[in-house]
Each structure stands twice: as C-alpha cells, then as structure tokens.
C-alpha cells in the first residue's frame, strides 16, 4: 500500500470472500483508498470448473461471494476474476445476471472486448498470467525485488503501447 500511496496511483486487486472475512484490515485499507476490488470466488481453492455441470451450484458460489463482498466493502462488485482463472461456459451469464460489468478470466487477447451473454454484454478485461504473483514468486522463484522490477518493466511496456495507440 505504501508504494501506491507514495506515487498517488489508485490500484485494483482481487480478494476472495474468505480473505475479506478473515483479513478485514487488507480489505479496509484497499477500500479506504478507493481501489477497485474484484470479486475472486468464495475461497481460493474452490474452482468454478468444479461446478461446470451444475449451474445452480456455480450460481450459489457467485451469489455467496457477492454477498460477502457487499457486506464487507459496502458496495457491489463490478468485476470478477475466478480462482485460477477457471470460469465455466456459464460464468459470464451468471455474472451479468448479477450486474457485474467486467470479467478477467479470458487470456485470449491483450485488449478489452465485449462478450455477449444472455443478459447483455460483459467486458472481458485481459489477464496476464505471465506477471501473476503466484507465477513469478512461486513457480519461477523470483524474489519480491525481482517481482517489483518485472512489474515496473511491464508497466513501461504498457505505457509505451498506450502512447502508440490512436485515442478517440
């Protein structure tokens, strides 16, 4: 939090419902700063793909998660990132059914795009697993200092690409 405060940049983060309940100080600190906090399943180990054949069970996980989110943050979730990026073919429909605006599980593009659902469109905001904390710190064994350097480099690349885009 300190580095984001120092440079004055708002951030977004994902928090699963169980963490929101058990680690309230983290949620409060992010919420007090006005960060966008994405709903991230009820608990990390519970994958929506475990319920891919049972839409009601998947819906219940999403509803339970969104309920905790609203109670702890005092606002409705706008976006969703499934644990381990494991949504199902029903996830987008279930999210729009509950008023969510964006979904971050899809990694097939590096630009946001609209996804049609039964309840209207939802924005797919791309997720890069290449700069994921778990990937870099656990799977690849980088130190936290190396992780910070990688994130800074990624931001530099994104800024360069942004400057090359046509803005309407």
Predicted regions and their residues:
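Catalytic alpha-helical scaffold of carbohydrate-active enzymes acting on polysaccharides/glycoconjugates
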Residues: 1-79, 84-124, 145-168
């Amino acid at each position: 939090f300190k580095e984001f405060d120092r440079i004055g940049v708002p951030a977004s983060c994902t928090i699963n419902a169980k963490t929101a309940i058990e680690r309230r100080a983290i949620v409060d600190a992010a919420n007090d700063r006005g960060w966008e906090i994405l709903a991230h399943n009820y608990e990390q180990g519970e994958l929506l793909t475990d319920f891919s054949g049972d839409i009601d069970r998947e819906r219940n996980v999403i509803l339970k998660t969104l309920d905790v989110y609203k109670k702890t943050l005092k606002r409705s979730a706008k976006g969703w990132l499934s644990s381990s990026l494991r949504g199902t073919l029903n996830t987008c429909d279930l999210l729009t059914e509950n008023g969510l605006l964006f979904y971050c599980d899809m990694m097939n593009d590096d630009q946001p795009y609209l996804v049609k659902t039964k309840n209207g469109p939802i924005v797919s905001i791309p997720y890069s697993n290449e700069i994921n904390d778990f990937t870099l710190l656990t799977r690849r064994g980088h130190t936290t200092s190396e992780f910070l350097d990688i994130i800074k480099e990624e931001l530099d690349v994104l800024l360069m690409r942004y400057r090359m885009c046509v803005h309407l």
